[in-house]
Design a protein with these regions (language model features):
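Amphipathic, membrane-active segments
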Residues: 7, 11-69
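Membrane-insertion modules used to breach or fuse lipid bilayers
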Residues: 1-4, 8-20, 116-127
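Detector for methionine-enriched segments
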Residues: 1, 9-12, 53, 58, ...
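Residue-level signal for well-ordered alpha-helical segments
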Residues: 2-5, 9-12, 31, 110, ...
C-alpha cells in the first residue's frame, strides 16, 4: 500500500468513491446488463472486458500490496478506452437533450419523455462505470508511482484530482443541460392538462422519474450543482376548475354584463 500519508488519503478517497459507485451500479444492474447484452457497438462491448481486467488487477494489488510491471501493463492502456466510453455516454445524453429542445408539440412530450425514461438508466450506468473504472486505475497508478517514483507522488495526486474534477464537470454539464430541458417541458405540459388530459399527466410522471434518476446519480458522484426539481402539474379537475373560476372572474369585471337579447331577436 502507499506509504505517504497524502497518497494514502487520496487512495482512500478514491476507494470510497469506487465503493459508493459500485452500490449505485447494483441498483441499476439489470438495465446496464440489457445494454451490454443487446448492444453491438464496439465501444459499449468493451466495457465489460475492461471492467473485468481492472477488477482483477485491483484484486491482485490488494492481495500482494504492490504493483509489478506485469500487473501495471494490464491496465496502463485502459484510460483511453474509459474516456471513449464516457464520451459515448455523454453524446447519447446530449442527443436526448437535443431531441427535447427541438420538440415543441405538447402532445409529443409524452412519447419523448418515455424514451428518455427508458434509456437514461443505461447511459447513467455507463457513466458511473467509467468513473468507477478510472478511479480504480488511479488507485493502481498512485501505488505504482509510490513504488517507482515516490518523489513524484504529490504531483501525481494533484494531477489525478484535477483530471477527475474535469471529467465530473463534463458529466455534470451534460446532465444539467438535460435537466433544464426537462424542467421546461414540465412547465409546458403542466399548462396543457385541460387540452391533453391523458398525455400531460403521463409526461409529468415520466419527467419526475427521470429527475429522480438524475438526482440519484448526482448524489452518488457528489455532483452538487445538479438541482433538478419538477413540481407536480395540476390535475384535469384542478385545471378545469381554474378555467371556470377565471371565466367567472372575467364576467364579474367592471364593465362586463350578461348579454340580454334585444326585442327584435325575441320577436323572431
Amino acid at each position: 500500500m502507499l506509504t505517504g500519508i497524502s497518497g494514502v488519503m487520496a487512495q482512500m478517497a478514491l476507494e470510497q468513491a469506487v465503493s459508493e459507485i459500485t452500490d449505485y451500479l447494483k441498483e441499476i444492474d439489470a438495465k446496464l446488463d440489457d445494454l451490454l447484452r443487446d448492444q453491438k457497438d464496439q465501444t459499449v462491448s468493451k466495457l465489460a472486458g475492461i471492467s473485468h481486467m481492472i477488477d482483477e488487477t485491483m484484486f491482485i494489488y490488494q492481495q500482494v500490496g504492490s504493483i509489478s510491471a506485469t500487473t501495471w501493463s494490464k491496465v496502463s492502456g485502459c484510460p483511453q478506452d474509459i474516456a471513449t466510453i464516457q464520451a459515448y455516454a455523454i453524446a447519447k445524453i446530449k442527443s436526448l437533450t437535443e431531441k427535447a429542445e427541438r420538440e415543441q408539440d405538447p402532445k409529443q412530450v409524452r412519447p419523448l419523455t418515455q424514451q428518455i425514461r427508458q434509456e437514461i438508466h443505461q447511459w447513467l450506468g455507463m457513466l458511473a462505470s467509467a468513473v468507477k473504472m478510472q478511479d480504480q486505475v488511479s488507485c493502481i497508478e498512485l501505488a505504482r508511482v509510490c513504488q517507482e517514483e515516490p518523489e513524484q507522488l504529490e504531483a501525481y495526486k494533484k494531477g489525478i484530482v484535477l483530471a477527475r474534477n474535469k471529467r465530473l464537470e463534463e458529466i455534470e454539464q451534460s446532465l444539467n443541460a438535460l435537466g433544464k430541458q426537462l424542467e421546461e417541458k414540465a412547465k409546458t405540459v403542466g399548462g396543457q392538462v385541460l387540452l391533453n388530459p391523458y398525455s400531460s399527466p403521463h409526461a409529468i410522471a415520466n419527467i419526475e422519474s427521470i429527475a429522480s434518476d438524475l438526482n440519484a446519480f448526482a448524489s452518488t458522484l457528489q455532483l452538487e450543482h445538479i438541482h433538478l426539481h419538477v413540481e407536480d402539474g395540476p390535475t384535469w379537475i384542478e385545471a378545469a376548475g381554474k378555467a371556470v373560476d377565471d371565466t367567472g372572474k372575467a364576467c364579474r369585471m367592471p364593465g362586463s354584463r350578461p348579454h340580454t337579447p334585444s326585442k327584435t331577436s325575441v320577436m323572431r
